[in-house]
Design a protein with these regions (language model features):
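N-terminal secretory signal peptides
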Residues: 1-15
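N-terminal cap/lid segment of alpha/beta-hydrolase-fold proteins
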Residues: 39-71
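Primarily recognizes the serine-hydrolase "nucleophile elbow" in alpha/beta-hydrolase
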Residues: 146-208
Length: 299
């Protein structure tokens, strides 16, 4: 991870990050987050089946996840939610519930399950060096395949499959959209397209952009120092010469937004841009056949 990206993730007001992230998948989050931001969105579980689940990866590892879906319904469109660098904490769970309230089955796998607990690291640098950098892309993408399979066995319609991801998960969303032709669409929130290559991260999304399998909506902040605007211009150029299905990809850059402008639990949150991006996300999934708002069987 590049230094500007690490810097962009450090909040500019004091709060106990470990305590905050420790509230993963639903316990104790609201009390600690409200001291950070009164703007934080809390979505209830009324009418939903929501909570922690687990499933086996291809290598037999048990992968924990958070899922939310309308109670008692099947044949649901599926959204895979890829977590930020901080792992599956309550903000990511809340995003799943927001999708579920609109009729989706949304599931967020813990893609750090083998390497460790993101809440245990007291600094961004330690989190990156001791956990995130040790997570191989190939493993992550395989675990997302397993997540998709689980969703198909638990009420999801895999003919209506989308993916979205934030920050670290935005980069992973790019890579998965370059991998899985069965996706209908993807939405990337401030996911970088270039970065340092390592044995665990051998390719950047830009390197594979000519193989993009689905249309992607990219949502970025112009003030995000971790994502150079010229890298987005390069990405657009490569996509324009790639498969026809991907040429409809769109990039939206918000002039006054920093990194993590959707993260309503952090000082980086920009309400107007976040709401616009969310509306665009829902429209994107509708337009590309993930949802037509006429879905779901059962009461």
């Amino acid at each position: 991870m590049l230094t500007p990206e690490i810097d962009s993730l450090v909040p500019h007001v004091p709060f106990n990050r470990r305590t905050f992230i420790k509230a993963a998948v639903g316990s104790g989050f609201a009390a600690c987050v409200m001291a950070v931001s009164a703007q934080t969105i809390i979505t209830d579980t009324d009418g939903l089946d929501a909570g922690p689940v687990g499933f086996k990866a291809a290598d037999g590892t048990l992968i924990p996840a958070y899922r939310a879906q309308p109670k008692g319904k099947t044949n649901l469109p599926v959204i895979i939610v890829i977590h930020e660098i901080f792992g599956v904490h309550e903000h990511i769970a809340d995003v799943c519930r927001r999708f579920a309230k609109l009729g989706y089955l949304a599931v967020a796998p813990d893609l750090y399950a083998r390497e460790g607990d993101a809440s245990k690291f007291p600094s961004m640098q330690q989190l990156n060096d001791q956990l995130v950098s040790k997570v191989p892309d190939d493993q992550v993408l395989s675990d997302i395949d397993s997540t998709v399979a689980w969703a198909g066995e638990h009420g999801g319609d895999l003919h209506r499959l989308g993916i979205t991801g934030f920050c670290w998960g935005g980069r992973i969303t790019w890579l998965y959209a370059e991998r899985n032709p069965h996706l209908k669409a993807a939405v990337v929130w401030y996911g970088r397209v270039v970065g340092n290559k390592t044995a665990n991260n051998p390719a950047n999304p830009l390197d594979l952009a000519a193989n993009l399998k689905v249309p992607v909506l990219g949502l970025f902040g112009k003030l995000d120092q971790s994502i150079p605007q010229d890298s987005l211009a390069q990405m657009k150029q490569v996509i324009a010469t790639g498969p026809e299905i991907a040429r409809g990809s769109q990039f939206v850059v918000y002039d006054d937004a920093p990194h993590a402008f959707f993260a309503d639990y952090r000082p980086s949150y920009r309400k107007a841009d976040a709401e616009d991006g969310w509306a665009r996300t829902l429209a994107w999934f509708r337009e590309h056949g993930v949802s037509d708002r006429a879905f779901g069987k059962g009461a």
